[in-house]
Structures are given as C-alpha cells and as structure tokens.
Amino acid sequence: MKVQDVQNLNNINVTAPDQAAKLRYGLGAYANPRVQKDLYELTNSQVKKNPVEAVYEKFLAKYNPNALLERYMTEESVNKMLQEAPVVSKILAEKGVKPVVCIENLKGIRNSHVDTTVQVAVALADEMKLSKDDKQTIALGSLFHDFGKIMIPEEMLNKNGKLTPEERSVVDTHSQIGYELLKTTGMSSKALSIVRNHHRSASMTNDVLSKIVSVADVYSALTEERAYKGKMSSEDAMSIINSFVSEGKLDGKVVSALKNCLAKHNELAA
C-alpha cells in the first residue's frame, strides 16, 4: 500500500466544538474525510490559532500521521519494504549488523522527538514564507525523518553512554535506510530527500527543506531528555546550534528563523 492510499484513514468522527478545539499540535484526534470540511470551518471559527497551528492542523487532517505511522510500524510492513529494497540489508551487512526490525525503536520517539520536530519544522517553514505545498512536504518529511531507526539495534540507539566509532557509523545509516525503505511506498521525492538528507551538513546540500528539518531535528534532540543526556534549555540549545552554524553544519538563515520562532511561539521554547 502506498502513502497516498492511507491518507485520511480514521474511524473517529471529530465534530463536537470541544473536541475540535483540542486539535492543537497533538497526534491523537483527527477527522475522517466526511467531516474534514466542517471541522476546518468549526476550528477556524471557534479557536483562535496562529499560522503555525493552522498549517499543522491541515497537515494532520490531510495525512493523518497516526494512520501513516501505524500502517508502516509493523514487522509485516517493514519486511515487505526490505524485500523491495534489498540495498538496506547490504548497508547493514557492511556494518556487521543483521537486518532485524526493531519496532520499539520508533515507538519510543514517536510522540516526543518526532512530534516536536514536526512542530518546529512547520513553524520554521511558516516563518520563512514557504509555499503551502512545501510546508506539507516538510511536515511529512519530518514525521518520517527517523524512520530508518527501525533497523538500528536497540542497544546502540538507546545506549546509556557514548557510542563507539563503530556504533556511531551504524546509527548514522538510519537516514539512508529510512530513505530506501520509504522509497518503496510512493512517498514524494521531496519528502524522501528530507529523510535522506536531514543529517547532512548545510554546506553539503542546497535542499532548503532538508536544511529546515535538520535545524528542527537538532533543536528537538537537544531540548528533550534522552537515555544518555538530560533536557537542555532553549538558551543552551541555541548556543550549541549557533556553533553548528559556524562549523557549516546548520544553515544560518534557518537558525535565524528559529530564533524568531522561539520569540513568537512560547510553546516551542524548552
């Protein structure tokens, strides 16, 4: 089944005003196609939203992230992708790793890192005046940016300590692995580029959508708690992010947009 085949899938009707008002940044409640138009009108008339929220909600209704993630976060789905993308097994074999599907890897980051990354990426896209299509692409690409981690051994991904150079080289393959797996689903080439390039240095790519998700990804990772580190404040995170700009790892224009976003949207600050 292709990505477009599961857009808008849901069995939940969200029609009550109090339910509609709760469609704010979360990944829990969405309307099915029959009530989307009414829901848009309802939320737009009864809930005062900033542009970021509006774009994000339209993305939720169009793609239904829960449906997409649930569809692909099964061993059956990933094994089918592996059959259609044998290069993934080759990539892992070159690192001495067996191709084992680790569903739990994605479940742990799905409602924290992924959600925050999507929110920040959409905010950046709005701040940088990107087109509606590009905003939708950024939301989709950032939603799946870490999908390749489904093939990374859990003991490496969640290691309570510094990774060895060998382990780091394995973890770093998740971008290419995610790209190869999702390429079999019919996802758009622009969204796939985000998945593949979100860890690539800004100086090594001209893809502005990937640069945006890179900044959102780094900010999200720094400001959340991980097995190997504590949560960092927005101020401390920005200090590190600024150093990455100096090193050519992150794009300066995107980081400037992030500073503006943090000043405008308190909900994005850690």
Q: Where do the model's predicted regions map?
A:
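Short hydrophobic alpha-helical segments that form membrane-spanning helices or hydrophobic packing faces
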Residues: 256-260
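Acidic/His-rich, divalent-metal-binding segments that scaffold phosphate/diphosphate chemistry
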Residues: 51-172, 182-185, 190
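Non-Sec secretion/translocation targeting segments of pathogen effectors
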Residues: 1-30, 34-35, 39-45, 270
